Amino acid sequence: SPVWDTGLAMHAVLEANSEPDKTIMEKAANWLVERQILDVIGDWGANAHGVRPGGWAFQYWNDYYPDVDDTAVVVMALHRSDPDRYSEAIARGAEWIIGMQSGNGGWGAFDVDNEHHFLQHIPFADHGALLDPPTADVSARCLSMMAQMGHGPDNQAVARAIGYLKRGQEVNGSWYGSWG
């Protein structure tokens, strides 16, 4: 996905390079800002009542299905690039991500509290894609975004995310994700 790849590459360059080419970073940031979804409430709105749109989608022309994973990467890239210049996009993206946090403190990729496991027993559900439960990888990316923005454990969303990740750690010390 150009959105994911651009956000990830931009953030990596900014993290690793103390003097990146400002023209290149500005061009990438502006391209990302143009793709922020600010006016479409997709299926995610059914479980996220009152949350304003503000995310980014993995694919082009997929305004009804933005995802928190891409959004977190883009917000981190914009924040690292120029937090003042891109403050509106950053704030709206972070607001949307916080609004998409599930009751257990984690984040799914596209939805809130989409854990109706009985749906997995429907015969046409053999591929297991009817649910979008919170996962460690997506939740960790959202937590990283919030930490980069200066939110610590005293922030309610951060505390809930830390709790979710602690509860989800495997006995062997690892975490299991779904997307990355």
Residue ranges and their predicted role:
Residues 1-180:
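Preference for long, amphipathic alpha-helical scaffolds in soluble/luminal domains
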